[in-house]
């Protein structure tokens, strides 16, 4: 019986799935907004939310746990210096999944995954550079 097995395999081997989710987590922490398929987005949420909760308390042990999951020193630093303090008062729900239509080639349902309360990027610097 398949009771209580709450993991989507995403048609990948376990090492491929782990590497893919690690790369997607790093991309989400770096850009704070990524585009992916809906099933991958839902699995990514299960990885990212506990990491942000871990980053609320900046200890050496927590940094080591986050590094074991992310394997990227710069993203661990950003996680603990920017994202942890940003969500210190929020009790969970750090990500938002927005449906984004269907992919052209295979009609896969797409989604935007973003960190809530992310700073808005203004278009003014791009206009100044054009002038």
Swiss-Prot record:
Disulfide bonds: none annotated. Signal peptide: none annotated. GO terms for molecular function: structural constituent of ribosome. GO terms for cellular component: cytosolic large ribosomal subunit. Keywords: Ribonucleoprotein, Ribosomal protein. It comes from the Bacteria. PROSITE patterns: RIBOSOMAL_L17. GO terms for biological process: translation. It holds the Pfam family Ribosomal_L17. Belongs to the bacterial ribosomal protein bL17 family. NCBIfam families: L17. PANTHER family: LARGE RIBOSOMAL SUBUNIT PROTEIN BL17M, RIBOSOMAL PROTEIN L17. Part of the 50S ribosomal subunit. Contacts protein L32. This is Large ribosomal subunit protein bL17. The lineage of its organism: Bacteria, Pseudomonadati, Pseudomonadota, Betaproteobacteria, Burkholderiales.
């Amino acid at each position: 019986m398949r009771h209580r097995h709450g993991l989507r395999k995403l048609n990948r081997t376990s090492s491929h799935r782990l590497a893919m989710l690690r790369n997607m987590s790093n991309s989400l922490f770096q850009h704070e907004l990524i585009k992916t398929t809906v099933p991958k987005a839902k699995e990514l949420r299960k990885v990212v939310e506990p990491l942000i909760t871990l980053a609320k308390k900046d200890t050496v042990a927590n940094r080591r746990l986050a590094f074991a999951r992310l394997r990227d020193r710069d993203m661990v630093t950003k996680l603990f210096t920017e994202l942890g303090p940003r969500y210190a008062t929020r009790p969970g729900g750090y990500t938002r999944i927005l449906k984004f239509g269907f992919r052209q080639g295979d009609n896969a349902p797409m989604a935007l995954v973003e960190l809530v309360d992310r700073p808005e990027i203004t278009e003014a610097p791009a206009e100044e550079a054009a002038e």
